[in-house]
A protein has these predicted regions:
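Conserved beta-strand signature within the Rossmann-like core of class I S-adenosyl-L-methionine
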Residues: 125-135
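A short His-aromatic
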Residues: 108-109
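Hydrophobic adenine-recognition pocket in adenosine-nucleotide-binding enzymes
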Residues: 105
Length: 215
C-alpha cells in the first residue's frame, strides 16, 4: 500500500490541500476552538499545519498516517507531531483530543476495515470533521467509495450525531477542492462532556438534512 502513495501522490496532496485548508480551518476553528486536534490519514499534514498557524501554535496537533509519508514533504514536525500507523488496525492514543479530522481517507481502506477505522476515530475524540469519497469520484486506490449515509450510519451506531453544516457553507466556494466541499460533515458524540446545548443548537441552526448529493 505504501508504494501506491508515492512522492508524486504526496506532492499532489500538498497542491490540493493547502488552499482548501486555508478556507476550511478558520470556520472550523472559530466554531469549536479546539486545544488539540488529531488527523487520521493526515497525508502531508496541511490541515494540521493550518490549524497551528491559525491558532498561533496554541493547538496541539498529531498527524497519523503510514510509514510511506515523505519526511521532507510533511508540513508538521515529523518527530513531535507525526505518528506512523496502520489505519486498518485499532489505534489507541495516549489521550483524547478535542477534535479529530479524517478527510478523504475512508475510501482508501477496504470495506472490511471501515468499522475499525471509525472506532479508532471515535475513540480519539467526541467531535469529528469527516469526509470520504462518493461513488464515482475515483482516485488512487479508492476501494470503498460510499454515499455519506453509509458513514452517517456507522457514526450513529457509536452515538454520534451528524451535522451537515460544512457543505451548505462551502458548496459554491471554488477556492476549495471539490472533494472536500461536497463530502465534509461534522459528527458530535451525544451527551459528550464539553459539548453544551448552546453549541448543539448552533450546529442545528446551520445544517441541512439532504445527505446523498454531489456536484
Amino acid at each position: 500500500m505504501g508504494n501506491v502513495y508515492n512522492r508524486e501522490f504526496q506532492e499532489m496532496l500538498i497542491d490540493h490541500a493547502d488552499k482548501s485548508a486555508d478556507r476550511i480551518i478558520p470556520f472550523v476553528y472559530d466554531l469549536f476552538t479546539p486545544n488539540s486536534v488529531v488527523d487520521f490519514g493526515c497525508g502531508t499534514g496541511n490541515f494540521l499545519a493550518t490549524v497551528k498557524k491559525y491558532s498561533n501554535n496554541k493547538c496541539e496537533v498529531l498527524g497519523l498516517d503510514g510509514n510511506y509519508i515523505e519526511k521532507d514533504l510533511l508540513q508538521i514536525n515529523f518527530e513531535k507531531e507525526f505518528m506512523s500507523v496502520d489505519l486498518t488496525a485499532t489505534i489507541a492514543l495516549e489521550h483524547k483530543y478535542e477534535m479529530a479530522f479524517s478527510l478523504e481517507v475512508g475510501e482508501h481502506l477496504d470495506e472490511k476495515y471501515a468499522d475499525i477505522f471509525v472506532d479508532s476515530i471515535t475513540r480519539a475524540s467526541d467531535i469529528v470533521l469527516f469526509s470520504a469519497a462518493l461513488p464515482g469520484q475515483y482516485g488512487v486506490h479508492h476501494v470503498n467509495e460510499r454515499y455519506i449515509s453509509y458513514w452517517i450510519e456507522k457514526f450513529s451506531d457509536r452515538q454520534y450525531q451528524c451535522f451537515d453544516i460544512m457543505r451548505p457553507h462551502f458548496w459554491w466556494d471554488h477556492d476549495i477542492d471539490l472533494d472536500y466541499r461536497q463530502n465534509m460533515m461534522i459528527f458530535v458524540k451525544q451527551n459528550a462532556d464539553g459539548v453544551n446545548e448552546a453549541l448543539v443548537g448552533k450546529l442545528r441552526s446551520l445544517e441541512t438534512h439532504i445527505y446523498d448529493i454531489a456536484h
